[in-house]
Each structure stands twice: as structure tokens, then as C-alpha cells.
UniProtKB/Swiss-Prot annotation:
The entry's keywords: Ribonucleoprotein, Ribosomal protein, RNA-binding, rRNA-binding
Chain intervals for the UniProt region annotation (Disordered): 1-28
UniProt GO molecular function: small ribosomal subunit rRNA binding; structural constituent of ribosome
Gene Ontology BP term (one): translation
Family according to the record: Belongs to the bacterial ribosomal protein bS20 family.
Name of the gene encoding the protein in the UniProt record: rpsT
Described purpose of this protein according to its UniProt entry: Binds directly to 16S ribosomal RNA.
Record bears the keyword Amino-acid biosynthesis: no
Annotated protein name in UniProt: Small ribosomal subunit protein bS20
Length: 86
């Protein structure tokens, strides 16, 4: 454990940030899973609606630095291709 005051503060801040990021990452993954589930069920309209709900969430997390912008683009491209192929 840290002994210096600033190190203790950084440890507290780091833990808060870790929990916040974990929450956001979990939310984003849930939205992505909803799209995959809709694609698996074969309902194109539900899949497109789920994709439209997921897209701004993923973009926002990429903008804030939670994930890389290329990862966000890859998720969107793969899911959109699956929806289009239905």
C-alpha cells in the first residue's frame, strides 16, 4: 500500500476510474450482444433497431478512450455486414 499522500490519492482515483470504466465497458458489451442475439434470431428489423441503438454507444466509448476507434469501427462493420446478409 502507498505511504505517500499523493500516491494514496492516485490509488483511490485509479480504483474509481477502474470501476467507472468497467461499468461503461459492460454496458457497451450488452448493447453489442443484443445485436448479435437479434441477428441469431433472424429478425432483420429487430437487428437493425438494436444496431441503431448500439452505434452511438460504441462511438461515444471510442471518443472517450475506453476502446480504440478502430475497434469501434470493426464492431460496427462486422455487425452491419451480418445484418445486411440476412
Amino acid at each position: 500500500m502507498a505511504n505517500i499522500k499523493s500516491a494514496k490519492k492516485r490509488a483511490v482515483q485509479s480504483e474509481k476510474r477502474r470501476q467507472h470504466n468497467a461499468s461503461r465497458r459492460s454496458m457497451m458489451r450488452t448493447y453489442i450482444k443484443k445485436v448479435y442475439a437479434a441477428v441469431a434470431s433472424g429478425d432483420k428489423e429487430a437487428a437493425q433497431k438494436a444496431f441503431n441503438d448500439m452505434q452511438p454507444i460504441v462511438d461515444r466509448q471510442a471518443t472517450k478512450g475506453l476502446i480504440h476507434k478502430n475497434k469501434a469501427a470493426r464492431h460496427k462493420a462486422n455487425l452491419q455486414a451480418q445484418i445486411k446478409a440476412m
